Amino acid sequence: MKSQQEQHFDYVKIGIASPERVRQWGERTLPNGQTVGEVTKPETINYRTLKPEMDGLFCERIFGPAKDWECHCGKYKRVRHRGIVCERCGVEVTESRVRRHRMGYIKLAAAVTHVWYLKGIPSYLSILLDMALRDVEQIVYFNAYVVLDPGNATNLSYKQLLTEDQWLEIEEQLYSEDSQLEDVEVGIGAEAIERLLQELELEAVAEELREGIANSKGQKRAKLIKRLRVIDNFIATGARPEWMVLNSIPVIPPDLRPMVQLDGGRFATSDLNDLYRRVINRNNRLARLQEILAPEIIVRNEKRMLQEAVDALIDNGRRGRTVVGANNRPLKSLSDIIEGKQGRFRQNLLGKRVDYSGRSVIVVGPKLKIYQCGLPREMAIELFQPFVIQRLIKSTIVSNIKAAKKLIQRGDESVWDVLAEVITGHPVLLNRAPTLHRLGIQAFEPILVEGRAIQLHPLVCPAFNADFDGDQMAVHVPLSLEAQAEARLLMLACHNILSPATGKPIVAPSQDMVLGCYYLTAENPGAQRGAGRYFSSMDDALRAYEQGDVDLHAYVWLRYLGDVETNEADDRVLESETLEDGSILKIYRERKVRETAEGEMISQFIRTTPGRIIYNKTIQDALDLTERTLPEGLPV
């Protein structure tokens, strides 16, 4: 049995790769001792045999066989030849899936700068070299020379830019017989940038910058701090500045940039193959020109074209003219593949599909408790299927998994009863993208509902930043008992009343809820049906309203012995009357109170409306429930 090596890690760090690391990614030594990995030909596949060309972008020797357990020439076939390297074609006999992770590399005939570090915001190359971005660009794209060593020349300084004419003038002086100039060095292109970066002593520069920061202020200080921060990061990560200049380019595995044959015999290919082909063609042409000692101006032009080809491969359109393919469509570069919402990180790595999850539109569930959500039956039976199958077998309704699945597909009544049992006390997690803070994912107790939409309590909407205009939410089922316990104790919606950012309540009524509260408690002098009637209890008043005897906003008299708060103090007796039994009836603005001669209250009727009774009763019921559920001794 093949042993699997487990690797535990806490995080993935993305940094600059050294030239040696790039070579290590692509270079492999075959069991026969041969070293492979360098892609030297721009060809992809042979148009007659439809097999990958050797040393090309789909080379089987570099990336592995195109067919499982079969070499390029066909000498070795079948799994019994596993690990053998064919003597004729040099292809290792292994599985074709290695073509998804084996990389190659292109050894460049001239150094090129990485466009991210040159044209990114901020430009790290210009910050490290302490030069203007425009000047660095002129050097990289062969528009200006830079002084690498002024030697004994008094009119030159380190990192000074020179035009073509200025350099020719200095060159004439340098090579004349009576020249006094010595050790003057001038460079151009990415090689000059690489030399300047190699000469940077990071520790010494950092020390100088710290002294400069202490003695300066304003804009100059901010600029020094910016440069120091970049240098400190390089020191901390152990990366060297010259690694921002590339001498080798990694070639990603061929199955990640495929070429497929269409019905008409034509081929559809990834844009990356075209971009790699441009780089290889220009690189090979440059190597040939250097070999035949071509004039400097031609070599320099080819180096600039190589720089532009590598720029287009890494980030097409970042600088200069965008490289286009058929129909004038811009080619998708490596940056386009990994960046943005549809990129590799957000789409495929962070946004992976997971088991035991579903997704649907949310609608309001006004009758739900704050810790509940309405889960469509169709979704619930799919999410909780393993639990339902286990319960069906345990309760001997079916004898095996196959029979249980058939029962579920038929939608048998017994299945729904079992599902209701399974979801009782089993919380689910609801998540709404984008999850910007921890309240973007909360736990709820599921309630089975008809339809295909998830029902959500309106009070939790602010935490999710959700509304009901077509928003979608994802449902996840915590499987283990530990996950369920965490969901219930830490993530249940009723435990997340306060915002973790501000400490203020995030669960607050809004929109329909505020309007409903206003409508229930509003005054309407036109509502006269049942006005002035007396009711002995809240239930009597609500019954009369439900039967249509009283308007929602009609003023009625309700027997109520509790304290009543009003906007203005209601303690002025408007009228007083002594009744036959000796008791006294006192009439105030908002209430009628009957007292004994000694001043003890016998009864009290308050002036209110059925709407206000509904509002008060709802709040009172909620408070009574809280009092009953709180442990003894805790304040309400």
Swiss-Prot record:
Keywords: DNA-directed RNA polymerase, Magnesium, Metal-binding, Nucleotidyltransferase, Transcription, Transferase, Zinc. Gene3D superfamilies: 1.10.40.90, 2.40.40.20, RNA polymerase II, clamp domain, RNA polymerase Rpb1, domain 3. GO terms for molecular function: DNA binding; DNA-directed RNA polymerase activity; magnesium ion binding; zinc ion binding. One of its GO terms (biological process) is DNA-templated transcription. It comes from the Bacteria. Binds 1 Mg(2+) ion per subunit. Its cofactor is Mg(2+); Zn(2+). The keyword Magnesium applies. PANTHER family: DNA-DIRECTED RNA POLYMERASE (PTHR19376), DNA-DIRECTED RNA POLYMERASE SUBUNIT BETA (PTHR19376:SF54). This is DNA-directed RNA polymerase subunit gamma. It comes from Picosynechococcus sp. (strain ATCC 27264 / PCC 7002 / PR-6).
